Amino acid sequence: MKNSKAILQVPGTMKIISAEIPVPKEDEVLIKVEYVGICGSDVHGFESGPFIPPKDPNQEIGLGHECAGTVVAVGSRVRKFKPGDRVNIEPGVPCGHCRYCLEGKYNICPDVDFMATQPNYRGALTHYLCHPESFTYKLPDNMDTMEGALVEPAAVGMHAAMLADVKPGKKIIILGAGCILSLIHI
């Protein structure tokens, strides 16, 4: 198996580089990435650089966080997955011990490790990536990995619609053309 990944060199220029296939830690799965959605934040990162630039100017910057693929290896403590399982990921991995995480609001954890952003800028535009078992989800049999890559943006869109209390017959305006907004239109 070989691995490569796309990294941002400077705004507007990406490069495909060879990379080692990562080895999963004891609580991680190794995923062969099959599909990656392109989010508005990826477009911004490509055009202007990351929202929060890395402290190290030599830091590799990967893009992409909406992805799905197939498990090819698992860490020694992984119990929910086996090679061959089709999965998608929650791209934000919280600290697990702050006030918000303990209240079940891990999506607003101030120390979340969100793919393609600080602290490590690892992106999903790669052939293989490792991800924690607890933030990896098995796809149902009737969903392919292309659809699986859209679960995260669909969840964000659904959450936004629920917060806005959108109901049939209610007049709303949706501005924008990204993946999430396109899914809200549906």
What are these regions (language model features)?
Residues 2-4:
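Extreme N-terminal starter segment of soluble prokaryotic enzymes
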Residues 22-36, 51-99, 140-142:
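Glycine-rich beta-strand-centered segment in the early N-terminal region that forms part
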Residues 184-186:
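Conserved small/polar residues in nucleotide/adenosyl-binding loops
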Residues 181:
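Catalytic nucleophile loop
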Residues 41-46:
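Cytochrome P450 core scaffold surrounding the K-helix E-X-X-R motif
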Residues 12, 35-38, 91-94, 105, ...:
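Glycine-rich beta-alpha junction loops
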